[in-house]
């Protein structure tokens, strides 16, 4: 018995370790809300699954061939009580589960601003093949595959795509949302404490999809201001011409920063007045072209 308890404890420890850095290790209010909805839904479903499994084993044991005390009813066909239990419990469970998820989804509406005494930071996000462009309009800078935010400050993300549909997702901050060409999605997130995280593309988008990841750093306010100053002091300018180079298909792009950015660039990308990227090609249509694995500097 002690060995069994030890095995269970080790298994739980390994599972919890595997959750580190993911949606079950939230860093902000939206991430915690997502984790709560997931855990509550799991508990509600287990309340049905576990008794059902236990009853299946009990039925097999109770009505085994060697048990002569078990009641044998060869002509039994209907029981109102059993029908009531079989139908009412699943219906009530679905209603309860739906209510929990609906309330959680309403509270976690991605368009709803987060309440805070600090002013909200705006970051414009563009999904490219196969990299992420982050524009800080108020600071006049941009980065590729690197998102830096001040800890404890709400962030409003305006998200679009210069290629195919994609999904922007930072697991520890919560709520994945579509990046769509010709449209702008809104998402409000917050990192409560300084930390190093990662973000991903959560929808397949072609050859370089598996490498379409980005670094996420939440830092103290002073460090964020110092980082902004460093970026503004060096690096290239991101305008429509340099964006034309950036939008080309490339994978495993290193972290890149731009000291200045065209203030109308994001609007041009979202409205598609600036030409979008080529998008992933169908099999057999590469025409000899290769996907670049280099960066843009």
Please state what every model-predicted region is.
Residues 20-37, 63-297:
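Non-transmembrane, membrane-proximal soluble domains of secreted or membrane proteins
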Residues 1-6, 30-51, 85-88:
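Membrane-entry segments of alpha-helical transmembrane domains in multi-pass membrane proteins
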Residues 8, 16, 43-47, 120-122:
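Hydrophobic transmembrane signal anchors and adjacent membrane-proximal interface regions, especially
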Residues 1-21:
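N-terminal secretory/membrane targeting signals
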Residues 42, 51-55, 80, 100:
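Generic alpha-helix structural propensity
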Residues 11, 15, 47-54, 88, ...:
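Generic alpha-helical transmembrane segments of integral inner-membrane proteins
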Residues 51-66:
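Membrane-water interface of transmembrane alpha-helices
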């Amino acid at each position: 018995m002690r060995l069994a308890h030890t095995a269970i404890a080790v298994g739980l420890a390994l599972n919890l370790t595997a959750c580190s850095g993911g949606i079950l290790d939230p860093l902000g209010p939206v991430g915690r809300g997502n984790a709560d909805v997931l855990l509550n839904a799991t508990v509600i479903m287990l309340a049905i699954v576990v008794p059902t499994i236990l009853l299946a084993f009990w039925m097999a044991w109770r009505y085994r061939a060697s048990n002569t005390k078990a009641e044998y009813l060869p002509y039994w066909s209907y029981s109102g009580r059993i029908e009531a239990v079989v139908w009412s419990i699943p219906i009530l469970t679905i209603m309860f589960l739906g209510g929990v998820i609906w309330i959680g989804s309403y509270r976690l509406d991605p368009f709803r601003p987060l309440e805070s005494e600090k002013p909200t930071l705006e970051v414009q996000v563009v999904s490219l093949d196969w990299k992420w462009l982050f524009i800080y309009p108020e600071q006049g800078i941009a980065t590729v595959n690197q998102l830096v935010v001040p800890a404890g400050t709400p962030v409003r993300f305006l998200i679009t795509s210069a290629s195919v549909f994609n999904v922007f997702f930072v697991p520890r901050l919560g709520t994945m949302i579509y990046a769509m060409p010709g449209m702008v999605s809104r998402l409000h997130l917050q990192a409560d404490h300084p930390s190093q995280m990662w973000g991903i593309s959560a929808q397949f988008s072609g050859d370089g999809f598996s490498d379409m990841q980005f670094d996420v750093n939440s830092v103290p306010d002073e460090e964020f201001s110092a980082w902004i100053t460093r970026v503004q002091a060096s690096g290239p300018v991101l305008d429509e011409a340099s964006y034309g180079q950036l939008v080309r298909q490339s994978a495993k792009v290193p972290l890149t920063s731009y000291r200045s950015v065209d203030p109308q660039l994001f609007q041009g990308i979202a409205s598609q007045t600036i030409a979008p990227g080529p998008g992933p090609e169908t099999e057999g249509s590469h025409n000899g072209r290769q996907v670049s694995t280099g960066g843009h500097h």
